[in-house]
Amino acid sequence: MTVQKFITYNSVDINGKTLSDEYKLELNVLEKSGNYLIHKDILRHQSSQRQGTISTKTRSEVRGGGRKPWRQKGTGRARAGSSRSPLWKGGGVIFGPKPRKIILKLNKKERKLALQTLLYNKRNNISIIDNLETNLDLPKTKTFYSLCKNCEINLDQKILIIVGEKTIPLKLATRNIKNVELILASNLNTFSLLKAKQILMTPLAVKDIKEIYCG
């Protein structure tokens, strides 16, 4: 059963000062089976990240082994037809992995519902920073560090920054910080959301989330 929930946030500037602007998110949230749906979507996301290129050689693909090692009878040893038998060192692999595609499908409505439910569950960890994409004047890591200090953001925890557009100063300022992930609102996924302990959004990202996932 889905329930409509409303979340309202005040934005802050890069100096940590609270602004008068209010941003509201209207989310459709699953009450009982929400965790199950989130888990399904995370499995779908993780399976899509797999390369699936692992490959082993069978006895017919291993080089060599065309000649019979010794005659069939009279030697006292066990009979052998090829030195590339899976029983031999350097032989082929029995039932080894081969390249394959692993695709787990989830309906678009279910994916949106899982994302909205997780956003609601993480509502207390979300902060909206006004014009984060454009207000970082210097593309330096220390600029972002000072922003985190002003906004009381703990850099020892996983931080997810959701933006409407990736600007070069913001990308350069955050790329050397191991706990920070920068993501477009259009590419938002449950896996990144679940890992994050603190979530920073921009007003443009809130607008995109409303249009893409809450419509």
From Swiss-Prot:
Residues covered by region (Disordered): 48-85
Bias-annotated ranges (Basic residues): 65-76
For this protein, the record's InterPro entries field holds: Ribosomal_uL4, Ribosomal_uL4-like, Ribosomal_uL4_dom_sf
What are the UniProt keywords, alphabetically?
Chloroplast, Plastid, Ribonucleoprotein, Ribosomal protein, RNA-binding, rRNA-binding
Any one cellular-component term (Gene Ontology): chloroplast
Query: Could you tell me one molecular function GO term of this UniProt entry?
Result: structural constituent of ribosome
Record's compositionally biased regions (Polar residues): 48-57
| Biological process terms in GO annotation | translation
Pfam families tied to this protein: Ribosomal_L4
Q: Which SUPFAM superfamilies match?
A: Ribosomal protein L4
Q: Which Gene3D superfamilies match?
A: 3.40.1370.10
Family the UniProt entry places it in: Belongs to the universal ribosomal protein uL4 family.
Self-association and partners: Part of the 50S ribosomal subunit.
Role according to the record: Probably binds the 23S rRNA.
Q: Do you know which NCBIfam families this protein is assigned to?
A: rplD_bact (TIGR03953)
In terms of PANTHER family, this protein maps to: 50S RIBOSOMAL PROTEIN L4, LARGE RIBOSOMAL SUBUNIT PROTEIN UL4C
Q: Can you name this protein? A: Large ribosomal subunit protein uL4c
Which source organism does the UniProt entry give?
Trieres chinensis (Marine centric diatom)
Query: Could you read off the lineage of the organism from its UniProt record?
Result: Eukaryota, Sar, Stramenopiles, Ochrophyta, Bacillariophyta
Quick one: which gene encodes this? rpl4
